[in-house]
């Protein structure tokens, strides 16, 4: 399945919520009619079945983290194998992706931009270049920007933007050095309450 390359706001309107696909800290509902479906007049949203609601939630989370369907299913399988709550395990795995950590640390304005930094070999983990976006960052790992990439205007702009966002408590970032430490895996209370991971578990449990 190919990665979606179309308008980002269209996806957010389809899901009826901000997927944080665009840079900036201004709420997306000030940029577009988030409650209105894509289209000139906004297609009327049909009443969804339980399955439809579960599917929409899965699609929403998958798009937030920029993960393809097969990858997402594999994350679910891994989450189900781990001890503890499957839904919370799933979110922890998604949050542990290197591209997401780079975004959370403020080195990329969006997850897509962070993913590009990783693929362009601008990111190091514990002093070693890692160019795999899905690489799982472990507690106490140090993530940093390579020296030659520190002068990139997009990195500096992203860091300025990050100053306006709430800083994740599970990360420790030194903006001056352009590096950060992944102190621990985030707990459920650290993450967005707008995600209903139990719906995804119900979907895949069928």
From Swiss-Prot:
GO terms for cellular component: cytoplasm; cytosol; cytosolic small ribosomal subunit; small ribosomal subunit. One of its GO terms (biological process) is ribosomal small subunit biogenesis. Pfam families: Ribosomal_S4, S4. Residues 96-156 form the S4 RNA-binding domain. Changing residue 51 to D: In rpsD101; suppresses a temperature-sensitive mutant of release factor 1, R137P. Not a ram mutation. It comes from the Bacteria. InterPro entries: Ribosomal_uS4 (IPR022801), Ribosomal_uS4_bac-type (IPR005709), Ribosomal_uS4_CS (IPR018079), Ribosomal_uS4_N (IPR001912), S4_RNA-bd (IPR002942), S4_RNA-bd_sf (IPR036986). The keyword Transcription applies. One of its GO terms (molecular function) is rRNA binding. Keywords: Antibiotic resistance, Repressor, Ribonucleoprotein, Ribosomal protein, Ribosome biogenesis, RNA-binding, rRNA-binding, Transcription, Transcription antitermination, Transcription regulation, Transcription termination, Translation regulation. Part of the 30S ribosomal subunit. Contacts protein S5. With proteins S3 and S5 encircles the mRNA as it enters the ribosome, which may play a role in mRNA helicase processivity. Some nascent polypeptide chains are able to cross-link to this protein in situ. The rRNA transcription and antitermination complex (rrnTAC) consists of RNAP, NusA, NusB, NusE (rpsJ), NusG, SubB, ribosomal protein S4, DNA and precursor rRNA; S4 is more flexible than other subunits. One of two assembly initiator proteins for the 30S subunit, it binds directly to 16S rRNA where it nucleates assembly of the body of the 30S subunit. With S5 and S12 plays an important role in translational accuracy; many suppressors of streptomycin-dependent mutants of protein S12 are found in this protein, some but not all of which decrease translational accuracy (ram, ribosomal ambiguity mutations). Belongs to the universal ribosomal protein uS4 family. This is Small ribosomal subunit protein uS4. It comes from Escherichia coli (strain K12). The lineage of its organism: Bacteria, Pseudomonadati, Pseudomonadota, Gammaproteobacteria, Enterobacterales. The gene is rpsD.
């Amino acid at each position: 399945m190919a990665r979606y390359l179309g308008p980002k706001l269209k996806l957010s309107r389809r899901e009826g919520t901000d997927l944080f696909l665009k840079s900036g800290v201004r709420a997306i509902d000030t940029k577009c009619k988030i409650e209105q479906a894509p289209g000139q007049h906004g297609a009327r949203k049909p009443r969804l079945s339980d399955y439809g609601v579960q599917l929409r939630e899965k699609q929403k989370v998958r798009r937030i983290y920029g993960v393809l369907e097969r990858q997402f299913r594999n994350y679910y399988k891994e989450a189900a194998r781990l001890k503890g709550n499957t839904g919370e395990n799933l979110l922890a795995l998604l949050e542990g992706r290197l591209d997401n950590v780079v975004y959370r640390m403020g080195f990329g304005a969006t997850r897509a931009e962070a993913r590009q930094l990783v693929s362009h070999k601008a990111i190091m983990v514990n002093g070693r270049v890692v160019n795999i976006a899905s690489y799982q960052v472990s507690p106490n790992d140090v993530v940093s920007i390579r020296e030659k990439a520190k002068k990139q205007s997009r990195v500096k702009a992203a860091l300025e933007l990050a100053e306006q966002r709430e800083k994740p408590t599970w990360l420790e970032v030194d903006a001056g050095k352009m590096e950060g430490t992944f102190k621990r895996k985030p707990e459920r209370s650290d993450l967005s309450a707008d995600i209903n991971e139990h719906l995804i578990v119900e979907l895949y449990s069928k």
